[in-house]
Amino acid sequence: LSNRELVRRHFLESPLVKSETLTYSKTDEDFMRKLDEYIMHNMEQADLSVDDMADEMCMSSSNLFRKLKGIIGKNPNEYLRIKRLKRAAELLQQDKYSITDISLLVGFRSPTYFSSCFKKQFGITPTEFLEGGGD
């Protein structure tokens, strides 16, 4: 695997690795920074959509899809879910909120679905992460 692919995989599979670790061109870096800021400020909205993100980025949904796929290898919905799960891992580390509260804070309507997505993404449940299983 190429170094870029290894870094991308590490970002996707590790709960606390931030997207800033990925290497981009200056244009892509600015694009990702703006998108990440928008996601962070709107994360609680369970109905945040690809169309919302595309509108914020002044592009069509299909162009957003192509752009993200080219930069990080994920579509916008996958990237949004990953950003939500990574934010959840940060909140879990703070030990201030329950898993249910965190699931709602990051935009999941169902704590059960949140736990399922967390395990699928990182290989451990939120409870296991709290017990020291996270990176």
Label for each model-derived stretch:
Residues 51, 77, 100, 116, ...:
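Residues within the helices of the helix-turn-helix
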Residues 42-47, 75-76, 96, 125-126:
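Short helix/strand-capping hinge loops at secondary-structure junctions
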Residues 70-109, 131-135:
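Terminal helix-turn-helix DNA-binding modules in bacterial transcription factors
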Residues 116-135:
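…primarily DNA-binding HTH/wHTH and HhH modules…
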Residues 56, 105-106, 121:
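Residues within the alpha-helical elements of helix-turn-helix
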